[in-house]
Regions:
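Long, contiguous binding/interaction regions
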Residues: 112, 119, 159, 187, ...
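Conserved acetyl-CoA-binding loop of GNAT-fold acetyltransferases
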Residues: 141-151
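Acetyl-CoA-dependent GNAT
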Residues: 41-100, 183-184, 191-197, 201-206
């Protein structure tokens, strides 16, 4: 698969470099305890090598880095579960904490969607987002994604948060449920098709 370099107004989406893991490790941590699983501690050389290899050798995955015009690493885009026969895939995006709420994610998604439909010639793009992540959901809706369903996934096993006992989380407990020893979190499934994008692309991601 050809790995693209895509330029926008404020960002460049490019192939992943092995040095990107060290850049990521220098990001400021997410202060919200619900997102602390995004924060990475120190990694050994072997762990860094595996991180890079896992993301660059999988034929069903296209893992890309996002830079700003100053060359700072802002985050990553990932197209995965690539199904060439049915012309569909899923995607995810992750930004460093200090680069959120600045419009970078919206611009990156806009660029990705254009490349995905016009250059890759795919027809459907899917994503899953935690239902409590209202900021991300709003961004995806701006970019033309629509709800298609709801599912529950295991809460990150690295988390030691007491969702049902800690009063800090009383307002978001509705997004979680307990099944045996597992805590599950609600995810919204969303998608955009090429037809949806062509119909409304002039009004999206502004």
């Amino acid at each position: 698969m050809v790995i693209p370099t895509l330029k926008g107004i404020r960002i460049t989406i490019r192939p992943l470099h092995q040095a990107d893991i060290d850049k990521r490790l220098r990001w400021k941590p997410y202060p919200n305890p619900l997102y602390k699983h995004y924060n990475r501690g120190e990694m050994s050389v072997e762990e860094k090598d595996k991180w890079y290899e896992d993301r660059t050798t999988n034929p069903n995955m296209l893992y890309l880095a996002i830079d700003n015009n100053q060359g700072e690493l802002l985050g990553f885009l990932n197209i995965f579960d690539i199904d060439p026969e049915n012309r569909k895939a899923s995607f995810g995006i992750y930004l460093g904490y200090e680069y959120t709420n600045k419009g970078y994610g919206t611009e990156a998604i806009n660029i990705l969607i254009h490349y995905y439909f016009e250059k890759m010639k795919f027809r459907e793009l899917y994503l899953g987002v935690a239902a409590l992540n209202h900021r991300a959901i709003h961004c995806y809706q701006k970019c033309g994604f629509e709800y298609v369903g709801t599912t529950y996934n295991k809460h990150d096993p690295r988390s030691d948060l007491d969702i049902f006992g800690d009063e800090r989380f009383i307002d978001i407990r509705k997004y979680f449920k307990q099944e045996g020893d597992n805590i599950l979190v609600r995810f919204e499934e969303m998608k955009i098709t090429k037809e949806m994008w062509l119909t409304s692309k002039d009004n999206l991601c502004e």
